[in-house]
């Protein structure tokens, strides 16, 4: 393939990601103020160890973090987002890699966006960094990427403190020479398959009670109505996937507000989630005869449901 164009406002939107690598974190410092304590921990957690030799960056192969490299796809997003919630403290590492292609040597001004601490390397050379993670707002740092004619490996080494709702988010925005740059991924052999799968998923659209595609679904396409299960016990139950290979449309069940479509091509796995807003309706607790519960009866029902969830998990 000839490479992708930059996304909205010059953002790079095609990456490979490894991680997160998570390990227990402990610090002897103490503070009665929770937010001040977390801010202190973020100020000291980043190690900024030199990346050194990255080796071949291939889908399915292990990175320097001993985590698999994956192609990252999140329809319409300008950022890599692998955020999650941590009930105990963790030291988090994740790596992001992309390739910028140009026909001549140019110095490009870029903006790095992240809540994490990030070291940015261009062809193995450290070009800039965000020194420590933050809770909010997102950080922005401008830096210069010295691009050579041909393929240039851009490598983001990210570190974060995992505590409560943790924003493991990063993005790279090109501010000049936008028309002179194409984007690819380090694993050239997977780039064509990624482009095919992504183009198929981007063509999908909701029409009434159907999900329609511009072309027949490729081999390895399936879908599920599972998206995000708030009940931890139910979340452990494997999702049910239905085959969609060769279909131009999928007839969707009523009462299912979310549908996730997955395409697997070789080692690549891309997913896109669709929300059916009209299917998001209140669920009322009613007696068998259809009458409503009183306030006190409804409150007891809520408490019993909470107790059941906790006992199951």
Predicted regions and their residues:
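Extracellular beta-rich ligand/substrate-recognition surface
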Residues: 83-93, 131-136
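Short edge beta-strand/loop segments characteristic of extracellular beta-sandwich folds
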Residues: 99, 109-113, 210-216
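Extracellular and analogous surface-interaction loops
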Residues: 90-92, 96-108, 144-149
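Beta-strand-rich ligand-recognition modules
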Residues: 119-173, 229-247
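Short structured motifs
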Residues: 80-84, 95-97, 138-142, 199-201, ...
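A glycine-anchored, Pro-Gly-centered beta-turn/N-cap motif
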Residues: 106, 148-150, 246, 253-257
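Accessory carbohydrate-binding/adhesion or oligomerization-edge regions at the termini
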Residues: 1-77, 153-214, 220, 228-231, ...
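Aromatic-lined ligand-binding clefts that engage carbohydrates, nucleic acids, or primary amines
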Residues: 102, 107-121, 154
């Amino acid at each position: 393939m000839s490479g992708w164009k930059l996304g909205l406002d010059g953002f790079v939107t095609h990456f490979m990601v490894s991680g997160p690598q998570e390990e227990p974190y402990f610090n002897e410092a103490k503070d009665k103020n929770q937010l001040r304590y977390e801010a202190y921990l973020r100020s000291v957690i980043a190690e900024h160890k030199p990346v050194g030799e990255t080796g071949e960056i291939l889908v399915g192969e292990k990175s320097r973090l001993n985590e698999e490299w994956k192609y990252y796809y999140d329809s319409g997003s300008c950022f890599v987002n692998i955020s999650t919630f941590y009930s105990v403290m963790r030291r988090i590492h994740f790596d992001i890699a992309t390739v910028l292609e140009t026909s001549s040597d140019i110095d490009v001004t870029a903006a790095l966006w992240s809540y994490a601490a990030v070291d940015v390397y261009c062809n193995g050379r450290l070009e800039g960094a965000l020194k420590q993670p933050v809770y909010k707002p997102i950080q922005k740092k401008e830096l210069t990427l010295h691009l050579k004619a041909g393929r240039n490996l851009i490598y983001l080494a990210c570190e974060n403190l995992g505590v409560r709702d943790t924003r493991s988010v990063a993005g790279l925005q090109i501010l000049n020479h936008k028309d002179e740059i194409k984007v690819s991924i380090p694993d050239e052999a997977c780039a064509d398959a990624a482009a095919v799968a992504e183009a198929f998923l981007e063509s999908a659209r909701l029409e009434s009670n159907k999900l329609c595609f511009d072309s027949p679904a490729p081999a390895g396409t399936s879908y599920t109505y599972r998206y995000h299960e708030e009940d931890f016990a139910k979340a452990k139950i494997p999702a049910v996937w239905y085959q969609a290979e060769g279909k131009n449309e999928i007839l969707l069940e009523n009462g299912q507000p979310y549908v996730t479509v997955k395409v697997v091509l070789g080692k690549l796995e891309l997913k896109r989630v669709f929300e059916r807003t009209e299917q998001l309706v209140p669920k009322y607790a009613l007696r068998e005869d259809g009458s409503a519960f009183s306030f006190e009866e409804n409150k007891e029902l809520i408490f019993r449901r909470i107790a059941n969830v906790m006992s199951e998990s």
